[in-house]
A protein has these predicted regions:
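Cysteine endopeptidase catalytic domains of the caspase/legumain-like
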Residues: 1-240
């Protein structure tokens, strides 16, 4: 039996109770789960998660992650930055004018995951965030545009759907993928391409799809080469 490529966590939040709904996120999450399973990842997944359920799922993932040399997190849904920190927005989020109360009671900090990655530099740690959608209706006095830059710790690559402090584009059609996830799905299965080169191709595709309005961005401190799809020439020839 072929060894597992790694462990992936896929979270897709689309059906928000109070914020703008994100129709493409459900398909984005489902399609990413399928392609990661095809690439031989074990996948833990959840969709339309409330805050408590998000923390529970992340905790489950981190407990199992100790057993894998490669871990990947893919999140699609609303994401926000507050005072230089990035947060996932659960579907039951209720806006509060107080930053402290809002962050402590309504959001899920991505540092719940990035702290684990930083503490495990011997792993290949990958975080992919298709979460820089338009402001979900929060006051700009509290919430900034898009997500803020995150410095990847040793052994980590963090990929954003668009540049820091910018918003990403997506269709309102639930049968379509976002520009970023569409490009990611098209490129992640390409055989024998290093992860950094794969994300360059994703960036070029998104720039074309968005007429230059959206430019994906990565921050990487990976310390070893990583390929999502390693195939022999015979295996490639069989698919042609």
């Amino acid at each position: 039996m072929k060894a597992k490529k790694g462990l992936a966590l896929v979270i897709a939040n689309a059906d928000y109770l109070q914020q703008n709904k994100l129709p493409t996120c459900k398909k984005d999450g489902n399609d990413m789960q399928k392609v990661l399973e095809y690439l031989n990842f074990d996948v833990i997944s959840g969709s339309d998660l409330k805050r408590t359920s998000m923390y529970d799922l992340i905790s489950k993932f981190l407990e199992v992650a100790e057993l894998y040399s490669t871990i990947l997190v893919y999140y699609t849904g609303h994401g926000v930055q507050i005072d230089g920190e990035n947060y996932f927005v659960p579907i039951d989020c209720e806006y509060k004018n107080s930053k402290a109360i809002f962050t402590e009671t309504q959001l899920v900090g991505i540092n719940a995951i990035t702290d684990f990655m930083t503490a495990n530099p011997s792993k290949t740690n990958i975080m992919i965030l298709d979460a820089c959608r338009s402001n979900p209706g929060f006051s700009k006095d509290v919430v900034g545009d898009g997500l803020t830059e995150v410095m990847a710790g040793n052994g980590t690559l963090i990929a954003f759907a668009t540049a820091p402090n910018k918003v990403a584009l997506a269709s309102q059609n639930e049968d379509e993928n976002s520009f970023y996830t569409k490009a990611l799905l098209d490129n992640i299965v390409r055989p024998n391409i290093k992860i950094e080169d794969m994300f360059k191709s994703v960036r070029n595709d998104v720039v074309l799809l968005s007429d230059g309005e959206q430019v994906p961005w990565e921050n990487t401190s990976l310390n070893k080469d990583f390929y999502f799809n390693t195939m022999s020439q015979d295996e490639i020839d069989e698919q042609i």
